[in-house]
Amino acid sequence: MQKQDDFSFKYWTIKVQRGSILKSHEMENLQSTLGFPPPEMTFGNNYISIEYKNQPVVGFFTEDALKMVGTKPEDVMQVSFAKDWAKSRIKPGEEYPVIYPFDWTYYTDYQGTIQRPNAKFIEIDQVIPVQKILNAGQNLWFNEIILFEDELADNGKSMFDVRARVVQGHLILLARLVVRLDKVNVRLNETRIYIDLLNDFLLKDCRKKQATYDKIIKQIPVGGDKAALLDDNNWLSERLDTVDHKIYKLNF
């Protein structure tokens, strides 16, 4: 059963739906749509959608995110334990699975779904006013969802989550994909949506980050909890190298 929550201010509304992971028949239907097995924990009914004057503008949806997972042979991570992942997906009584080429780490460039006809993001130099947000006081509203998560046959983690909060005059959303492939690399994509609720404009800040696994391990302090830090997405984000950064304004 899904739980719904929303917050409205002037012309803006943010809607959230959150539920449990997909059931087996739902996973099979999604696999048929995608052409590859979905992540172990796929929250297919979860979403966050932002509306302006009662019309959807931009949102984050599980199926849309997974549709952007690479499906070409060059997208497949060729590492020693890729076959271990494939074997982990065999059901009792099945033969070795036939899996079409796809990025089994579920890396996706998904930055949200534009829901409004004729709306488009235009690249600009303007930045999100971080200090104004920090000075705006405590949260008036907060919610978070997970779109999907997979432990990659105990060889790391792939997780896509979305968090949104409202402070006085501002709405801030962070959608984050973290793909950690142990002993190989760590990749992270962050999409921030910022809305000035008083002046009615929307910015999108997109960043891609990455580093080798060894580089991250070397930054763990002596005596630090390795497992906890590798699962701390904020800690990882601060230590990865930014390889791409673009900011857009939504025209609609």
UniProtKB/Swiss-Prot annotation:
Top-level lineage group: Eukaryota
GO biological process, one term: TOR signaling
GO cellular-component term (any): cytosol
Gene Ontology molecular function: protein phosphatase activator activity
Alphabetized UniProt keyword annotations: Cytoplasm, Nucleus, Signal transduction inhibitor
Subcellular localization(s) per the UniProt record: Cytoplasm; Nucleus
Assigned protein family: Belongs to the TIP41 family.
The protein's role, per its UniProt record: Involved in negative regulation of the TOR signaling pathway in response to type of available nitrogen source. Activates the PP2A phosphatase ppa2.
Name of the protein this chain belongs to: Type 2A phosphatase activator tip41
Species this protein is from: Schizosaccharomyces pombe (strain 972 / ATCC 24843) (Fission yeast)
